[in-house]
Amino acid sequence: MVRIFPPRSIACWSEKSLAGPRSWSGLAEHHMSLGATLSVDYATFFALLRGICRSLVRHGFRQVLLLNGHGGNIAALTVVVNELAVEFDAPIATTTYFVLAQPAIAKILETQGAVRHACEAETSMVLALVPELVDMSLAAEAVGPTAPELRDIAGTVAAHRWQSFKARTSHGAIGDPRTASAEKGERLLQASAEAVARLITNAEFWKLPA
């Protein structure tokens, strides 16, 4: 879904901006136990983003936002941005759309407070974008766990340890897709795009001293 937000976000405001191509792979080791996953290691992830940011800075871009749509990238992107902003002496930032827009997302969803995995939210957004990929007659078979330990992404924890998705869910889903709808997906997409647009146009955010 993250490929959708830059064009939508740019459409929300009139100043000049460019949306670059999305990176097709990221850090997904936690999904490897479920199969059909392509993941890269941190060194590759960092090298790719470093090359992209270096190119943009050399071409005169004054602000760079690395927009993320995958939970497995969040921790690494913080480190990437910290290192590249210093190396290139440029305002390089990152955000994850479903964390940035979480307050608005929570108001739209019925069965969960944030985006999870193949859930009410993600299924709704896919229904809005490529409905031919979704067979809602099978939704009942794709209901995933909603145990308390599976906290909302936007929550906080005081400690962390790595855990594979297979330890959490037998089929990869976390959440309940049965209440998903294309109408809800369109609202989620628009709310997320608007949140990204507000960040892009937040002059104070970009003027923060390094």
Label each region the model flagged.
Residues 1-65, 71-210:
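Extended, histidine- and acidic-residue-enriched regions that form the cofactor-binding/catalytic faces
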